[in-house]
Amino acid sequence: RFKNELLLRYIKYKIPRKMTIAKILKAMDLEEMQPFLDEAELTADTLLTKENYEDIVKVFTIHWDIVTEHYRRSNNAAKAYYKAAVGNSKSAVIVDIGWAASGFSALRYLIEDEWKLDCKVRGLVAGSTYLHDMDIIEPQMTNDIITSYMFSQRINREIRRDHDVKRMYGAFTEIMLSAPAPSFIGFDFDDDGRIKYEFDYPEAEGYSMINEIQDGIHDFVNDYTKHFAKYPCMMNICGSDAYAVCRQVISCPEYFSNLFADYPVNRAVGSASFETGSLGKLIENEFVK
């Protein structure tokens, strides 16, 4: 069901990165696809381009059974994990920053449709904006399966229009909400059959900066709740007010860059697939004024 999403995120979105097919397959952990790509004259050292993208997709589509079989073990481990986590619950909420809710949508499909865990899943996202995923998120928002806090096509549309992903606004917001830990990749089983968690390469150079950001968030929350303890209505913060913090950051990219110029940033899915750069260099190269 989410074949197109996988191909978009792991292949199409990487066209500007000037990556080889070998690096793309490594990021996807699908090196066994290389012989089939070789048959189509798409060798390991071939650079991904907009001209050969459809040819690559065609090979993946023809041999999609290889892809699904490769990820079957991870799927089974994920099922075991979420079955234990859900337990006897009849409903659950998944919280994510956004922006297209593709991760939530895939997990909801697995829990409700493929694994049939008898649990209805709802999603909460900070904001909803997207380039290619309207058919995934919009029907779910219309049916109240997904609720967006700060902005979406349904609420605070003026904020959604201003939140330009091409100007790195999404990246700035995600940095503010990052964790001092490697990105989670997926599930697997160890040699004893127990569930284990797999993580991407740690970008440890940024952990101290993340901790500073989170300390600042905690300080603000503590001060806010202290000063308004007698006014519970002040705890009901609307999405547009919450976005004021994001707006302050994205309206001053130079200030943000001065504070976090050395923050490590990987613009591609899978650290093994692309050399990590710095936020300062990224703003210099990609920010559209």
Where are these regions (language model features)?
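Long, contiguous domain-sized segments
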Residues: 3-289
